[in-house]
């Protein structure tokens, strides 16, 4: 009997907590894509997305990976413009 009462109270508590938090999260989920786009415009938010690139006339090697390292995207032993 005590276990049944405890289970009923626990279910009521969890149901009430779902209804309390659901009202607050409704607006947050709708605005989530807008917030992410807004954060990407901030330089501090996108520090991890920035990559260093090699300037022109800098040695980059002779592979396809070297072209990815150059700021211009052209690599023939050195970065080209």
Swiss-Prot record:
Keywords per UniProt: Calcium channel impairing toxin, Cleavage on pair of basic residues, Disulfide bond, Ion channel impairing toxin, Knottin, Neurotoxin, Presynaptic neurotoxin, Secreted, Signal, Toxin, Voltage-gated calcium channel impairing toxin
PROSITE patterns: OMEGA_CONOTOXIN (PS60004)
Taxonomic lineage from the root: Eukaryota, Metazoa, Spiralia, Lophotrochozoa, Mollusca
Protein function: Omega-conotoxins act at presynaptic membranes, they bind and block voltage-gated calcium channels (Cav).
Name of the protein this chain belongs to: Omega-conotoxin-like 3
Domain of life: Eukaryota
TM segment ranges: none
Domain notes: The presence of a 'disulfide through disulfide knot' structurally defines this protein as a knottin. The cysteine framework is VI/VII (C-C-CC-C-C).
InterPro entries assigned: Conotoxin, Conotoxin_omega-typ_CS
Propeptide residue range(s): 23-51
Location in the cell: Secreted
UniProt GO molecular function: calcium channel regulator activity; ion channel inhibitor activity; toxin activity
Entry GO CC: extracellular region; host cell presynaptic membrane
Disulphide bridges: 53-71, 60-75, 70-79
């Amino acid at each position: 009997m005590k276990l049944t009462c405890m289970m009923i109270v626990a279910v009521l508590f969890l149901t009430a907590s779902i209804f309390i938090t659901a009202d607050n999260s409704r607006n947050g989920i709708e605005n989530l894509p807008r917030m992410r786009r807004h954060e990407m415009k901030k330089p501090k938010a996108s520090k991890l997305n920035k990559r260093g690139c090699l300037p022109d006339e800098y040695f980059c090697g002779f592979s396809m990976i070297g072209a990815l390292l150059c700021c211009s995207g052209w690599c023939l032993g050195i970065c080209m413009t």
